[in-house]
């Protein structure tokens, strides 16, 4: 039950089981602070990811302040915006750990550079947290632009982080070393996407890969950040051999290595399953797969993973949004290309659920699993004290309401908050 205490100059929310009440009249000890904007979500079927049944949630200061099945009348003096979700499913906001926030591409000339996308492209897809990175083009695009774009997305209300480096070695950095970038720049949480088994890579050696992974690991220890090495996997026949050698010949923990695109070839996915059994977290990419192609869709791969008996927390799914999806001929020329879309994450989740997988079993790959790997303690779950990043689905599984940092970005399927240069088209 939500309990209130009303004094002469403050309204206090008392959370049962907590030691300290939460003041709703502004910052502690600052009588001139503006009141906290409060949002009450009523009648939500909460999947946290586990199902919690129908709950009411009070949001404020970017956090979930309270959650419960019973709700008392609110004090008349308290200004609260209310949204009745009418029994809709409420999920943690999706976490996309592989996004080309500055735009990717460039493999077929400068005209093929993908432009960056605005904040509403993410939020209308139910995504509230992104990790930006550089890919093939880490020359014309650099870490300064990447970091500036991350900060711009934050100013627009999205949670945004980034990996330092890119496809190639030596990695481009801001401080001169990847370890320095992770230690001294708050938004940088790992290294990536470093390309292996790909004709576009720098053909890194085992020693070079180990040095990068060690820098990521030590920086993670020093800062409490993710400290992961996010690895782009190409179509090369060597597959994950370098990672297997790294695990066999070093003391580095498997969690440091986070290979992505592992569903691009069926044999590569089998290799990735074996790595997950050793303790690595593997990442599927939600790209389109044509009939007869030697690849698994992200939905197919997730189903196979869940049926394999491998630890359910060691798989994540990302979109590669903003990245170019090229197809090459035998000479390495681009035959055709597409662009990764943020909406592919929610489409994949719905596809898996339609095939009979319970939502609470499918959802962690999009929420709590990436939050755990990236050490984002306040994300990926619906609980009191967590960030107020939430996604309410309509009956068809589309994003009906999206809340990022306690702010409504999508309401009843309509975008309420757009980026500075976004139009309504």
Feature names for model-found ranges:
Residues 117-142, 148-170, 185-199, 221-235, ...:
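Divalent metal-dependent hydrolysis catalytic cores, especially in the metallo-beta-lactamase
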Residues 44, 62, 87, 98, ...:
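Divalent metal-coordination and catalytic microenvironments
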Residues 214-326, 334-335:
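Active-site core of metal-dependent hydrolases
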Residues 61-64, 381-425:
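C-terminal cap of metal-dependent C-N hydrolases
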Residues 307-393:
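His/Asp/Glu-enriched, well-ordered alpha-helical/loop segment
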Residues 74-77, 85-148:
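Metal-associated gating/positioning segment near the N- to mid-region
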Residues 3, 10-12, 21-27, 31-32:
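Short, positively charged and aromatic/hydrophobic N-terminal segments
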Residues 26, 30-31, 36-39, 46-91, ...:
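Histidine-rich, glycine-flanked metal-binding segment
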């Amino acid at each position: 039950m939500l309990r209130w205490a009303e004094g002469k100059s403050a309204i206090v929310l008392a959370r049962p089981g907590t030691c300290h009440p939460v003041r709703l009249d502004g910052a502690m000890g600052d009588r001139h602070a503006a009141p906290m904007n409060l949002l009450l979500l009523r009648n939500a079927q909460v999947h946290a990811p586990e199902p919690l049944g129908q709950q009411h949630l009070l949001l404020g200061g970017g956090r979930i302040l309270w959650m419960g099945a019973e709700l008392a009348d609110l004090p008349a003096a308290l200004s609260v915006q209310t949204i009745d979700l009418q029994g809709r499913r409420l999920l943690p906001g999706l976490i996309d750990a592989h996004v080309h926030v500055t735009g990717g591409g460039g493999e077929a000339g400068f005209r093929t550079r993908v432009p960056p996308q605005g904040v509403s492209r993410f939020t209308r897809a139910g995504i509230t947290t992104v990790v930006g990175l550089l890919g093939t083009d880490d020359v014309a695009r650099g870490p300064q632009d990447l970091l500036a774009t991350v900060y711009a997305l934050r100013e627009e209300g999205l949670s945004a982080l980034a990996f330092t480096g890119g496809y190639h070695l030596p990695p481009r950095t801001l401080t001169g070393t990847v370890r320095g970038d992770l230690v001294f720049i708050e938004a940088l949480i790992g290294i990536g996407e470093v390309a292996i088994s790909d004709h576009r890579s720098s053909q890194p050696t085992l020693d070079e890969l180990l040095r990068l992974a060690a820098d990521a690991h030590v920086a993670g220890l020093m800062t409490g950040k993710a400290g992961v090495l996010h690895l782009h996997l190409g179509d090369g026949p060597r597959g994950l051999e370098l990672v297997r050698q790294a695990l066999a010949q070093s003391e580095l923990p498997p969690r440091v290595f986070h290979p992505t695109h592992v569903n691009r070839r069926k044999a590569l996915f089998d290799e990735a399953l074996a790595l997950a059994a050793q303790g690595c977290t593997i990442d599927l990419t939600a790209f389109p797969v044509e009939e007869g192609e030697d690849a698994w869709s992200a939905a197919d791969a997730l189903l196979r993973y869940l049926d394999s008996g491998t630890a359910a927390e060691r798989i994540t799914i990302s979109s590669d949004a903003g990245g170019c999806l090229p197809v090459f001929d035998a000479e390495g020329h681009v035959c055709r290309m597409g662009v990764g879309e943020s909406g592919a994450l929610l489409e994949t989740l719905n596809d898996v659920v339609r095939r009979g997988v319970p939502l609470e079993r499918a959802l962690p790959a999009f929420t709590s699993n990436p939050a755990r790997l990236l050490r984002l303690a306040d994300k990926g779950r619906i609980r009191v004290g967590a960030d107020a990043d939430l996604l309410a689905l309509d009956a068809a599984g589309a994003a009906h309401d999206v809340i990022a940092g306690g702010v409504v970005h999508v309401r009843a399927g309509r975008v309420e908050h757009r980026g500075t240069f976004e139009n309504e088209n």
